[in-house]
């Protein structure tokens, strides 16, 4: 069964270091999924091409344009997500955040996500841990342990970028090809899966018959 991975890249130019890193992560993920005996369809989403549509959506009561709605549906349907952004002012780009803000709040629940970022210097690498990981944790996505940061000096030189790329891709592949249903008796069902707790016993009933001693 073929899996699907959507790569969201928030680079503002073409070519860009953000797209270059996204390409490397996508290639490594294809290889990692293939190594597990599965195939994967990878689709790229260049957010700069949706910038006008996202702005229109933001100022029109969050009613997405047809183009943006199509992309959102692909993200929801994907088995995994690779999210790559440049670092601006010690955080992800506004373009990237706008796209995330326009997603349904439940769109990424349980979805495997690989996070990555690019910047001019290694000093910005903590953005992955203090901005991107908390963002996707809030959205209840499953973020792979290895996040990938690439500074300008990491491209074209002898660095450990390739090793980090392949390690992160392997972690994403493991989640993407995993069974979509849990082991019998352990998978959430019914109210658990929907997040509803079900009937709640009144506290006074719990204390009935107890004298407090």
Regions found by a protein language model. Name each.
Residues 147-213:
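Glycine-rich phosphate/pyrophosphate-binding loop and the adjoining helix
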Residues 21-25, 128, 168:
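Hydrophobic alpha-helical membrane-association signature
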Residues 63-139:
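Helix-loop-strand module that forms the ligand-binding subsite of alpha/beta enzymes
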Residues 5, 42, 113, 143-144:
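Hydrophobic/aromatic residues located in beta-strands of well-ordered beta-sheets
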Residues 1-84, 90-97, 197-213:
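N-terminal beta1-alpha1-beta2 submodule of the flavodoxin-like/Rossmannoid cofactor-binding fold
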Residues 12-15, 119-123, 154-155:
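Short histidine/acidic/glycine/proline-rich micro-motifs that form metal-
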Residues 30-35, 137, 141, 170-181:
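Generic secondary-structure signature for well-ordered alpha-helical cores
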Residues 43-54, 137-156:
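Mobile beta-alpha loop/short-helix "lid" or hinge segments that flank ligand
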């Amino acid at each position: 069964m073929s899996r699907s991975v959507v790569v969201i890249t928030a680079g503002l130019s073409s070519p860009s270091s953000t797209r270059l890193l996204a390409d490397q992560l996508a290639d490594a993920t294809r290889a990692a999924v293939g190594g597990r005996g599965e195939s994967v369809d990878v689709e790229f989403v260049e957010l700069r091409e949706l910038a006008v549509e996202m702005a229109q959506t933001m100022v029109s009561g969050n009613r997405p344009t047809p183009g943006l709605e199509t992309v959102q549906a692909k993200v929801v349907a994907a088995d995994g997500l690779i999210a790559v952004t440049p670092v601006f002012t010690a955080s992800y780009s506004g373009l990237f955040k706008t796209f995330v803000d326009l997603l349904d709040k439940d769109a990424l629940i349980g979805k495997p996500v690989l996070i990555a970022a690019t910047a001019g210097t290694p000093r910005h690498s903590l953005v992955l841990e203090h901005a991107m990981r908390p963002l996707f944790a809030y959205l209840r996505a499953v973020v792979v342990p290895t996040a990938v940061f690439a500074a300008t000096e990491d491209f074209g030189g002898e660095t450990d970028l390739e090793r980090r790329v392949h390690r992160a891709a392997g972690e994403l592949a493991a989640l993407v090809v995993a069974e979509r249903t849990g082991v019998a008796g352990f998978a959430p069902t019914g109210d658990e899966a929907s997040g509803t707790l079900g009937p709640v016993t009144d506290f006074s009933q719990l204390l009935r018959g107890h004298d407090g001693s």
